[in-house]
């Protein structure tokens, strides 16, 4: 695979989308965005593609809406054959390009690995994933091996003030008002 982008050394990247099939003969690709607003993927630049274990930097030359989706053309990718090599590759960005959030806002990735503890001090486990349900986000918490309630995993709604009492970034801890039996 020819690497037309610029190789980078930093390994911390966030996947924000994926390339689909080629579009046309001039190097365009379909883009599937994982961002809340699909078109927001184009606000983050440059993009990084993992090629042979290394992050390679690409800049978006142009993009447009097409039917119900989006297509993009990367700089230096001018023929269908080059674009075809990118099919199904994930699109990642450097976390530094994300906007700063206020003290009470969080990116999901910040919550992963945090310990979840009840207001009474019971350790429920560690956040391993988040789910988007439409009405509210949900913490997926992997329970401790010694969980007295026999739980392997808990789903805890991320409802601030009702369930989520405090998120302490520094201590990597989330305090919740939650019954360990659930």
From Swiss-Prot:
Broad class of the protein's primary localization: cytoplasm
Organism: Vibrio parahaemolyticus serotype O3:K6 (strain RIMD 2210633)
Comment, domains: The PRC barrel domain binds ribosomal protein uS19.
Gene3D superfamilies, per the entry: PRC-barrel domain, RimM
Signal sequence range: none
PANTHER family in the cross-refs: RIBOSOME MATURATION FACTOR RIMM (PTHR33692:SF1)
Keyword terms of this UniProt record: Chaperone, Cytoplasm, Ribosome biogenesis, rRNA processing
Localization: Cytoplasm
GO cellular component: cytoplasm; ribosome
One family name in Pfam for this protein: RimM
Name assigned to this protein: Ribosome maturation factor RimM
A single BP term in Gene Ontology: rRNA processing
Keyword Transmembrane helix: no
Protein function: An accessory protein needed during the final step in the assembly of 30S ribosomal subunit, possibly for assembly of the head region. Essential for efficient processing of 16S rRNA. May be needed both before and after RbfA during the maturation of 16S rRNA. It has affinity for free ribosomal 30S subunits but not for 70S ribosomes.
Domain PRC barrel residue range list: 103-182
Record family assignment: Belongs to the RimM family.
Oligomer status and interactors: Binds ribosomal protein uS19.
GO molecular function per UniProt: ribosome binding
Keyword Hydrolase attached: no
InterPro entries, sorted: PRC-brl_dom, PRC_barrel-like_sf, RimM, RimM_N, RimM_N_sf, Transl_B-barrel_sf
